Design a protein with these regions (language model features):
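Short, low-complexity, polybasic intrinsically disordered segments
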Residues: 106-119, 160
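An acidic-aromatic substrate-binding cleft motif
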Residues: 9-10
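Solvent-exposed beta-strand motifs enriched in subsets of small alpha/beta binding domains
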Residues: 94-97, 111, 144
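Short coil/turn segments at secondary-structure boundaries
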Residues: 29-32, 106-107, 156-157
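Short, solvent-exposed loop/turn segments at secondary-structure junctions
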Residues: 100-104
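Periplasmic peptidoglycan-binding/anchoring modules of Gram-negative envelope and division proteins
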Residues: 4, 18, 24-95, 123, ...
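Periplasmic OmpA/Pal-like peptidoglycan-binding modules at the C-termini of bacterial envelope proteins
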Residues: 13-16, 20, 25, 83, ...
Length: 183
């Protein structure tokens, strides 16, 4: 198998952000196909709450990073779908992160749930167009639920800033880190 020269670098790393404590196991219990789109919409609905606690360009984050990266994800999935239709095998490496507010065990669990919500979104994207490729191993996803981010974030005195502060916001994410295509 030869590695093809498809270039996805314009998309990478693709960071997709999550509100505090989302998704939860209950989200998946109530909605087994709970996916990132739902998390994205729910997060956007909390913009006013984040604005109360965080004046540091929060609107820029919500527009550029949250909305912008969701749109970028959809463009990437369209391209991947086309490449898969052309006979490529594609491997995605996805890493989940959490802020430092909770303990390590919880952070690994929520990171894993975040990855699961993204995989569910990929599965449901464009009426399930990518499903067959996941089933026949033409689209492979390597999951790395890291837990707590490797950033230099310090625990602050204010628990509200541990939820609404810039460091916490930027650490609650799933990143598509690597994409390899083979033909």
């Amino acid at each position: 198998i030869e590695k093809d020269k498809l270039d996805y670098s314009v998309f990478l790393p693709l960071n997709l952000y999550f509100d505090n404590n989302t998704p939860s196991e209950l989200d998946f219990t109530e909605t087994p196909n709970y996916n990132y789109k739902r998390s994205y919409i729910d997060y956007f609905m909390n913009l006013d709450k984040y604005t109360l606690y965080n004046k540091e360009n929060i609107n820029v984050f919500f527009e550029d990073s949250l909305r912008g990266n969701f749109n970028k994800l959809n463009k990437l999935l369209d391209i991947l779908s086309n490449n898969l239709q052309q006979g490529y095998t594609i491997n995605l490496k996805i890493r989940g992160y959490a802020s430092q507010l909770a303990d390590d065990r919880y952070n690994v669990k929520i990171s894993s749930l975040r990855i699961k919500s993204l995989i569910n979104y990929i599965t449901s994207y464009s009426k399930g167009a990518l499903n067959q490729y996941l089933t026949n191993n033409k689209l492979n996803i390597v999951e790395v639920p890291l837990g707590e981010s490797l950033s230099l974030e310090n625990k602050k005195n204010s628990s509200m800033m541990n939820i609404y502060g810039t460091d916490a916001i930027l650490n609650r994410k799933v990143s598509i880190l690597k994409i390899d295509a083979y033909k």
